[in-house]
């Protein structure tokens, strides 16, 4: 019996064998480890889920960097995101492979992406072929905002003047200057994670991202965007274990108006948690076996 290549979504293969990045001691990581509050998500290596241990004490305030900014460094997971990894918009009715959920959209109030007619058709076509077409089958990075609600955890490092985000999934990395500099890439350069620059507005880190390509989906259901999408993210610390995350997407080619997602990020409290090596092999035969066993037909590699 063949093993499916996929975990929670098509194209997911985690190989937990080699430590990818050792955690460096920082001002925001000196709290003694304890059992997890939300669990560590998929992937990673830690000291177990702490079954039967006492609950954590109340969370304290965020620690500060040397320049007085909130220290966001540590390991994080998207928590209570309404099943956005399956489908970011409201999906109250289960579909094959997709459990129902409220999604993560808070604006518009109906919880749906305000598509133009052309891109609504693209999204429907993507869902109809998602087992064969999902970009992660080709080892693409997830892009924004999809990267933020993946089932795998990520690490934040905060050297002076920067925020670095390192995901286990696809080994995606974002290096974000936080000095409010202008965007530096020409319009013709389009990336999976785009060109991100940040600035502090009080306690909130605001990250502005342009220059995204159109080769990623917003979720595993095939919701889509164009190469004109502009994303503004807001990271607002609540306490030492919680960051409120919000992102607004504006795309005049794909959407009739901007729309916004919002959900909390929870600090990973597993003892000795580490991000692990991740392997994704485009064209792996298990992908074709999975597609065939679910009644689909494997397609050629997307150029």
Predicted regions span which residues?
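PEST-like low-complexity, intrinsically disordered acidic/proline/serine-rich tracts
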Residues: 2-303
